[in-house]
């Protein structure tokens, strides 16, 4: 079926590429991310990204700003709660020492495409892979 074909196509295209340190941000205050038990972690891994918080054994852990800075992600991807890029995603611009910021790899994916597990998750997965791939190419 279409879902399985699309999934297999994404696996074939992205799953064996060089790893990219990835920070996925769900919310601003507190900073909420995806831990190792969240589907988002699996999506990041499918894209050959490395979730910088994969070792946290929670679905949606709160993390500190310092932890993100220390991990120094190569790409930052946020979702928020609406269809447009949340203003708080621009906050990272004040941290030019972060590789994702200095190389302009801060992206938005609408939450309906990645935070609600439906067939549309494949659309969000493709966007995730494309964003991670941009950081890989640089």
Question: Which role fits each region the language model picked out?
Answer:
Residues 1-138:
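N-terminal ligand-binding lobe of clamshell/alpha-beta domains
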């Amino acid at each position: 079926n279409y879902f399985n074909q699309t999934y297999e196509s994404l696996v074939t295209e992205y799953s064996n590429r060089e790893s990219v340190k990835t920070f996925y941000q769900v919310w601003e205050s507190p900073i909420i991310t995806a831990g190792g038990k969240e589907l988002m972690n699996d999506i990041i891994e499918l894209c050959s990204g490395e979730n910088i918080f994969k070792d946290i054994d929670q679905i949606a852990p709160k993390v500190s700003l310092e932890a993100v800075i220390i991990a120094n992600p190569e790409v930052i991807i946020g979702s928020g709660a609406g269809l447009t890029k949340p203003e708080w995603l621009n906050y990272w611009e004040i941290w030019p020492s972060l590789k994702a910021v200095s190389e302009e790899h801060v992206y938005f994916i609408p939450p309906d495409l990645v935070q609600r597990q439906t067939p549309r998750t494949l659309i969000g997965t493709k966007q995730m892979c494309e964003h991670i791939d941009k950081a890989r190419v640089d």
